[in-house]
Amino acid sequence: MIREIVHYDAPVLRAKGKEVDPTSPAIQKLIDDLFDTMRHARGVGLASQQIGEAVQVAVIDISGVKERPSKMWIKGEPVDPEDYMPMILINPVLKPTKTKITSHEGCLSFPGLTLDIPRAQRVAVKTRTLDGGHFEFDAGGLLGRAVLHEVDHLHGRLYIDHISAEERREIKEDLEYIKRGEPIPEREED
């Protein structure tokens, strides 16, 4: 079922998600709703907080995104990330590298706002599977960025938390538009 995406300033976006039982039928329903909602919004990732539920569940699907390549490794061996899409993250634990890369990011909870965000170049991921097991992989490129972005949501962190105070002042007006549910007006380039 397609659910409403919660926009910036909703308290649930700052809520740390509770761990869940991955085998629960309620979690499967939540995952189905996350995928339906993400695809309807044409996103590459969506966290449970973004549809109003503060639990540690997120979904990602970078299939077909060629302009921003993804990388994935399992047990140190490179694999094709498309073979593992769509992806479900349940109670994920991350270990990001110290090396950072800055690239542009958007967020379905911040419609129309794209920012340059520094993120780890690569991240090791351990997540639960629907049968209660574990799945471990490393991710880089767009997939790594999407994992880091969505798992931030699961802990009540937003991509605007990664920008400087000066940049935050520059987007203050845009954030007010989003809070009111209004589109950010087009601005002329300097």
Question: Which positions does each model-derived feature cover?
Answer:
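Active-site rim/adjacent substrate-binding subdomains
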Residues: 1-148, 153-190
